[in-house]
A protein has these predicted regions:
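Rhodanese-like catalytic fold shared by cysteine-dependent sulfurtransferases
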Residues: 1-33, 41-82, 91-155
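Short, surface-exposed ligand- or partner-binding patches at beta-edge/loop junctions that are enriched
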Residues: 86
Length: 155
């Protein structure tokens, strides 16, 4: 049986990753760049990169195609655009970028370190109403809080 990080690692052989400072440069130099945020809507509403498109990981593949309830026309038309996929920590985005490549997206990358790294690089985030998010609030939000029942039981 594979574990989550093994699956991510295997996809990395085919997926290009960029660092937060690279995304900052790409956003400044390519106004056509599409940032896809594959986190859940409640995560996106809390904070995201301004102008990014929320396409939750669970509907990504159907959102990339015509004739589905989840179809997102901007995403379907983006197969030849530069696309950067983001998530919280850079793992879900690798899986999503891999799927998008299989679906014919030619210039897709994953944000290594995810929005945590974006925040650590002190780049701006906005909330669901597009208001600036305080970086201290973002720091608190991105601090992992595992419940006891989420921890691996002792052997």
């Amino acid at each position: 049986m594979k574990r989550f990080l093994q699956l991510v690692s295997e996809c990395l052989t085919d997926v290009r990753e960029i660092m937060p400072w690279d995304l900052e440069e790409r956003l400044a130099s390519n106004p056509d760049l599409l940032v896809i945020d594959v986190r859940e809507p409640y995560e996106f509403d809390a904070m995201h990169i301004a102008g990014s498109l929320n396409v939750p990981r669970g509907i990504l593949e159907s959102a990339c195609e015509w004739e589905y309830e989840e179809t997102m026309p901007e995403l379907v038309r983006a197969r030849d655009r530069e696309v950067v996929v983001v998530c919280r920590s850079g793992y879900r985005s690798v899986l999503a970028a891999h799927s998008m490549q299989l679906l014919g997206y030619r210039n897709v990358a994953s944000l290594k370190t995810g929005l945590r790294g974006w925040k650590d690089y002190e780049q701006p985030l906005v909330d669901g109403q597009e208001r600036d998010v305080d970086l201290d609030e973002a720091d608190d939000y991105f601090t992992p809080r595992l419940r006891e029942d989420q921890l691996r039981p002792p052997d």
